[in-house]
Amino acid sequence: MNPHTIRIPSDRFAFFTDEFQSKIFEIEKETSIHTTPTEIKVSAPDYLQLNNTLLKKSRTFNHRAKKLYNFITRWKKDFNDPTLTTSHLRTLTKRIKEELNKELYRFIPRKKFDESIRNEKYVLLTLHKQPEASIDVIGRYYEDQEANITNISRSLPDNWKLLIKEHTNAIGDRSIFFFTRLLRDPAIVLIDENESSLNIIENAQLVITVSGTVAYEAAMKGIPSATFADTFFNKLGLCKKLTLEDLRNSDIPELIEHIKESESKSHEFKNWILRNSFEGIISDPISNPKCITSHNIEKVSDAILTVGREIIPSARIQ
């Protein structure tokens, strides 16, 4: 049992019963802390906006100089930490590689989402930051993102495009060669990472991700979407789990028609997700300082007690 954000709305969380965060613990009894909103607004999660602010700061000269100073002096390092990288050279090599990738990324041709692309038939795929649990744990066996892109591209009709959008947090993680290999495929278009995913979703024929929120957003907006991993938002009729067998046996238009055959189920899903989630922010102080406010801690504590009573009804949980 682990608490985690439900992403939409971003100020609510649920308790998941599996390590893949695909199964939500369902509350049988109505509780006093279920002050649920009547409508769910699809918007970019708060944590993405916070991350983008931190990323912008991290690319300034002052921040890079401070990182270099901290690396040389190592005054922040706890040498009793068993997870600490012992090789100074290995750490330095990794950091130099990341900074080099960030600078070289500027030379990768990326397109704005303008009318020339908007009027095309396209599939949107958003990249994950890697390594990260969302793809290496939740998306196990589909963690090779380049292979996923190749497999999807092979299933596209000749006149369709595959739009690829980099995760802003991941800039510097992938080498320039990753992108140059992708761009050899004439069907692939690399979209500027600062473009709004919500705007791109609006005209997409299909949205695909390993386990990302973008598929959740698309399905809530009535756009067909698919995830390679099992997710709790596969309960939405317009968000299906995708496999290699699906790509092998059907082309993309056939997959879209299959997804559209399912009812949207958005109203039922909204009621279900709100009934089984709680107000509160599950995060860390760096990503979202609001998580350690007394008001939020009280909300999270109440939710934990509520779920505890649900699991062990006879227990005297105060």
Predicted regions and their residues:
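Active-site and donor-binding regions of nucleotide-sugar-utilizing enzymes
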Residues: 1-31
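A nucleotide-sugar donor-handling region in carbohydrate enzymes
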Residues: 23-133
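A donor-sugar binding/catalytic signature common to diverse glycosyltransferases
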Residues: 193-240
